[in-house]
Structure formats: structure tokens, C-alpha cells
Amino acid sequence: EMCIRDSYKGVIHTGIDGATGYNIMINAVDHPYNSFYVWEQLYDKAGNPIEGAYVDQNGDNKIDEEDLVAYKKSAPDVFMGLTSQLSYKNWDLSFALRASIGNYAYNNVQSNREAWDGSQMYDQTGFLKNRLTSAWKTNFKTGQYRSSYYVQNASFVRMDNISLGYTFNKLFNDKQSARVYVTVQNPFVITKYDGLDPEISGSGVDNNIYPRPRVFMLGLNLNF
């Protein structure tokens, strides 16, 4: 899926944190809208990325701007949803499910926080920054911001909410009833994405360091 650019690059856009002047996306002829614009990463036998090792696309024995390629895209191939309301005797169950398939995201949280150089290890006051456990896998000494390694599969299936209830008929008399229910918002998401949340804004660049909350609610409806 890697394609070498023609002489006209296209519209290069969308900056990233940690790398001033680097734009990570491109709109170009013959490529999907909002493709990522990166160097094609090379890997060792164990499947780990090799620092500074990229495919020399034009064969000139150096890695530079001419080796950047359009790679993957931020838009999904398929977006779907499913809602349902089920009931059995006094029980009722409802849920809302969504899926986004074929979309990718640039994990800027990892690319900006994995390297072991001073600028990524310490803040401006000299204190250690929070480290990502993934830094032990890449072991990059300096930031590899333009690596295709950070363009990750962000397809997902998310349960937005699910609710289970039970209705007590004839609570005190024939005219009174009560329904007890429990609802969970954002109970789970199924994804291969390494970041906190695969559901990225339209830019396709993930700078999210805060998890989406999971909310539990217990309710009671009374009918008189």
C-alpha cells in the first residue's frame, strides 16, 4: 500500500506535537483523502522497529523528503451501528453498538513520548515526564516522528450504552408499578489500537492522554 509520489507532492497538512514543521498527512492524486505521509519503517527479525531505518523509496542511498510516501488513511471503509430493545416477561434489555472498520490513526502520544533523549524524558523544570511502557519495545534514542510505525489500525467496535431493567407489576395495587434498571455508558471497546481510544477526531492524529469515562447509573421509575 506504499506508493512513491510523483513530482507534485499534493497538499501536505496537519502538524504534530513534538516536531515543529512536520506535517503528517497528504491529499494527493491517486491516494485516499487524508492519507498519512511517512517513511516506511523497517523491522528486525523480532518484529521491532529499527531506529532510523526506513525504505529508500527512490534508491539514492539516503533517507530524506523524497522517500516520504502516502500510507493508509484516517477515514473508515465502513461505519455501522446497531441498536436493539429486547424484553422477556418482566425483564428488558437495550443497547447501542457502533463499529468503524478500515480507519487508521497516527499515534502522536507514542511518537512524542517514547524516545529516551532529554527533551522527551524531562520537562522544562527538569523533572521526569511520564513514560510509556511501549518505550521499552521501541527503545528509540530520538523521536521517530515520521515513522509508519506510528500509523496504527484504529478500527473498533464500541458499545455506547447498555441498559438492563426489571418491572414490578402490581407493586402495591393493580395501578402501581415500578421499574428498576442499571445502565452503563461506554462499557467496552474492541480494538487493536495501542492508544487510549481509537475513536479519533477527523484529523486522524491522536493526542489524547485522558481516557473516556465509563459511567454506571442505577435508576428507579415509579408509576401510580
Q: Which residue stretches match the model-derived regions?
A:
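Transmembrane beta-strands of outer-membrane beta-barrel pores
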Residues: 5-6, 88-90, 99-103, 161, ...
